[in-house]
């Protein structure tokens, strides 16, 4: 069975996810996902997207020019077997849209529900589902 080292690697993976999303390092962000990752944001007024090649252009179109700050807290990681794990992360994010957009600001709270797979390149996110508990919006005048 897996070790504390695996948990540490998954924590590092998620930390990279948050940092790379906020710094808009899209090609490096690609590397945190499996090629066939499933992204489900339907509970956040979003959609389901299959594959990193579909997800990244969608993500860039949504937040490419938005200043973002994502934080993950209190991970609950379960090692299923040597090469698979599941996780739930409490999350908080803040987003600031550029001038001229209908939304100015969002402060959100919720959870990431994820699965992970160990690959030859280390642990990767194989599925991600975002759920929201609360959102505070500020709209443009």
Show which residues each predicted segment covers.
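Short, low-complexity N-terminal intrinsically disordered segments enriched in polar/charged residues
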Residues: 1-35
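Charge-dense, low-complexity intrinsically disordered segments
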Residues: 4, 46-49, 103
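Intrinsic disorder/low-complexity signal
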Residues: 5-7, 21, 39, 82, ...
């Amino acid at each position: 069975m897996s070790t504390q080292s695996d948990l540490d690697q998954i924590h590092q993976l998620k930390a990279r996810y948050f940092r790379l999303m906020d710094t808009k390092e899209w090609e490096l962000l690609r590397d945190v996902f499996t090629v066939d990752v499933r992204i489900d944001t339907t509970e956040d007024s979003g959609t389901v997207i299959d594959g990193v090649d579909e997800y990244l252009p969608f993500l860039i179109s949504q937040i490419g020019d938005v200043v973002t700050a994502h934080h993950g807290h209190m991970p609950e990681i379960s090692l299923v077997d040597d090469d698979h794990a599941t996780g739930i992360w409490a999350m908080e994010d803040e987003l600031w849209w550029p001038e001229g957009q209908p939304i100015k600001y969002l402060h959100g709270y919720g959870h990431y529900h994820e699965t992970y797979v160990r690959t030859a390149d280390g642990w990767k996110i194989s599925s991600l589902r975002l759920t929201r508990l609360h959102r505070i919006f500020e709209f443009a005048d």
